[in-house]
Amino acid sequence: MLDPNLLRNEPDAVAEKLARRGFKLDVDKLGALEERRKVLQVKTENLQAERNSRSKSIGQAKARGEDIEPLRLEVNKLGEELDAAKAELDALQAEIRDIALTIPNLPADEVPVGKDENDNVEVSRWGTPREFDFEVRDHVTLGEMHSGLDFAAAVKLTGSRFVVMKGQIARMHRALAQFMLDLHTEQHGYSENYVPYLVNQDTLYGTGQLPKFAGDLFHTRPLEEEADTSNYALIPTAEVPLTNLVRGEIIDEDDLPIKMTAHTPCFRSEAGSYGRDTRGLIRMHQFDKVEMVQIVRPEDSMAALEEMTGHAEKVLQLLGLPYRKIILCTGDMGFGACKTYDLEVWIPAQNTYREISSCSNVWDFQARRMQARCRSKSDKKTRLVHTLNGSGLAVGRTLVAVMENYQQADGRIEVPEVLRPYMNGLEYIG
């Protein structure tokens, strides 16, 4: 959520920045609502003061032995008017808040202006795509050759965009997640967390999934005996529970940064993706991801973004997977991000790079929703923290990249050296 004072005092400047990312802010509507809010605020305060004054007069009149009934009736009437004014003010403030919750974050000044993914800017490349002297098989064909990917079984169990992994392919999937967690915890300074896969509405509001992206989530039906408390949704990413661990907290600045990681399944409806990536593991309703989250001082967040992106890059480098790093343009950034780097890994069968990690600085956008603050020992004032999140990495897509980049002419899949300790020294699948 943006700073309400910024929306009130600099609406035109905010509108200009939002226009860079293709969002039209209705400045006139917000201005009219704000003027109405000011009028109601003054009215409420005046009624409150008048009622307090009249209430005090009742006691004074009673002490003088005067008839207090007219004053009592007047106080009651003022109370009714005050209640009505408060209700109108509350409704208006709720309307303003509802609008504010749909406004995306402001892009950082250095983010390239653009409309969509075609306007993203490549920053760097690492590694050289392998040249094959045989016909490249995609991961689906390789998985079926080794009886490791069973999409038909998943359709029987659930439906499309799910998979059953088996044997050494399932083992490699697990090995990848363990490797990523060990790297982030042992070398990059993250603490490992196990988090719920179901979260409540407040948590989803905190990180910005609600109200705007309710349709992207899988929601549970409340239990009858807990109808008011069990309106949960499956997490679309571990960013949601990890970041909300600091919701409502005031953190000592000496304890920052807080760096957390978790390996979880992620659940997404993929609304609007009909017909896209229907073959294989690239776009699933359920997929695993190792997530990185950092909670930092405001002045440290841009440096933290560079660091976090480097942590994701290290996974790809140790796996020997060619990739490119791009900075997303204003029109392609996520709702809460002010700056985002994507890492795209080389997928031989598609002869292109595909997203495997997205690392974002969310500035104070989530912190304001969550009321997550920090305070230094020398200053009693609190300030909002900055939050960052990044994939380190998407496990299923990493599996795709390993299978395709490490395939052999006979269909075997070489196991990258860094994964062999997690697979009992296995050198090849097949």
From Swiss-Prot:
Keywords: Aminoacyl-tRNA synthetase, ATP-binding, Cytoplasm, Ligase, Nucleotide-binding, Protein biosynthesis. GO terms for cellular component: cytoplasm. One of its GO terms (biological process) is selenocysteine biosynthetic process. It catalyses: tRNA(Ser) + L-serine + ATP = L-seryl-tRNA(Ser) + AMP + diphosphate + H(+); tRNA(Sec) + L-serine + ATP = L-seryl-tRNA(Sec) + AMP + diphosphate + H(+). CDD domains: SerRS_core. NCBIfam families: serS. Homodimer. The tRNA molecule binds across the dimer. This is Serine--tRNA ligase. It comes from Escherichia fergusonii (strain ATCC 35469 / DSM 13698 / CCUG 18766 / IAM 14443 / JCM 21226 / LMG 7866 / NBRC 102419 / NCTC 12128 / CDC 0568-73).
